[in-house]
From Swiss-Prot:
Keywords on record: ATP synthesis, CF(0), Chloroplast, Hydrogen ion transport, Ion transport, Lipid-binding, Membrane, Plastid, Thylakoid, Transmembrane, Transmembrane helix, Transport
TM spans (from-to): 7-27, 57-77
Designated name of the protein: ATP synthase subunit c, chloroplastic
UniProt record similarity statement: Belongs to the ATPase C chain family.
Assembly: F-type ATPases have 2 components, F(1) - the catalytic core - and F(0) - the membrane proton channel. F(1) has five subunits: alpha(3), beta(3), gamma(1), delta(1), epsilon(1). F(0) has four main subunits: a(1), b(1), b'(1) and c(10-14). The alpha and beta chains form an alternating ring which encloses part of the gamma chain. F(1) is attached to F(0) by a central stalk formed by the gamma and epsilon chains, while a peripheral stalk is formed by the delta, b and b' chains.
Any one GO cellular component localisation term in the record: proton-transporting ATP synthase complex
Membrane topology: Multi-pass membrane protein
Any one Gene Ontology molecular-function term assigned to this protein's record: proton-transporting ATP synthase activity, rotational mechanism
Gene name tied to this protein: atpH
Lineage: Eukaryota, Viridiplantae, Streptophyta, Embryophyta, Tracheophyta
Site residues, Reversibly protonated during proton transport: E61
Length: 81
């Protein structure tokens, strides 16, 4: 196994997880903040807002999991070796 390919795979795996978590992290923070503001404005709509928030957080978290899957593929099932 070429050490250059191994090193590049490890760096790419780290970058894929890191970059894949930036967008969803910012989005989750914004969504949670807006949900808290919405609940503060209309406390009677708490259940509906919370359900929508949890569903949207799950979709955002899926993007980070895709980055993790790419990283694991680069580390353990490397197609370049």
């Amino acid at each position: 196994m070429n050490p250059l390919i191994s090193a590049a795979s490890v760096i790419a795996a780290g970058l894929s997880v890191g970059l894949a978590s930036i967008g969803p992290g910012i989005g989750q923070g914004t969504a949670a903040g807006q949900a808290v503001e919405g609940i503060a404005r209309q406390p009677e709509a708490e259940g509906k807002i919370r359900g929508t928030l949890l569903l949207s957080l799950a979709f955002m978290e899926a993007l980070t999991i895709y980055g993790l899957v790419v990283a694991l593929a680069l580390l353990f099932a490397n197609p370049f070796v």
